[in-house]
Design a protein with these regions (language model features):
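Histidine- and acidic-residue-rich, metal-dependent catalytic cores
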Residues: 2-128
Length: 128
């Protein structure tokens, strides 16, 4: 019997969430691609760390699935007006249900102004 890998769980979750609504995961995939390119270029992370960060970046808006029914399609609303609500829901999800819970704070900070992140650990800052 083969062990289930974190990557397999991530892909299962991503694909299941896409069935509920595609927008957050499609947006997350684009963000993850940009995060990967920027962090790889920076040269501060090993490939396995980049893989974890790409997983978190892909699902950074997972909290949007907890917003009001029907509002998920209004990306401007949950990215701007309700940004803290979906950021906190996403943080709680990753903190409690994730093999990469050490990166959960990046989800909570992903809408915070860069200048306010000065006291935050650089890995969270890079991801946020």
């Amino acid at each position: 019997m083969e062990y289930i890998k974190s990557k397999d769980i991530f892909l299962l979750m991503r694909d299941t969430l896409k069935l509920i609504h595609q927008r957050p995961m499609a947006h997350g995939s684009r963000v993850a691609y940009m995060v990967y390119l920027m962090l790889r270029e920076g040269g501060r992370y090993e490939e396995f760390e980049l893989a974890d960060m790409v997983m978190v970046a892909t699902m950074h808006d997972i909290g949007a699935y907890m917003t009001e029914a029907g509002k998920i399609n209004d990306i401007l609303r949950y990215e701007a007006k309700d940004s803290m609500a979906h950021s906190i829901y996403g943080y709680l999800f990753f903190k409690h249900l994730s093999p990469v819970k050490d990166l959960a704070k990046a989800i909570m900070y992903h809408h915070m102004d860069y200048d306010k992140l000065q006291k935050v650990d650089y890995a969270y800052k890079d991801l946020a």
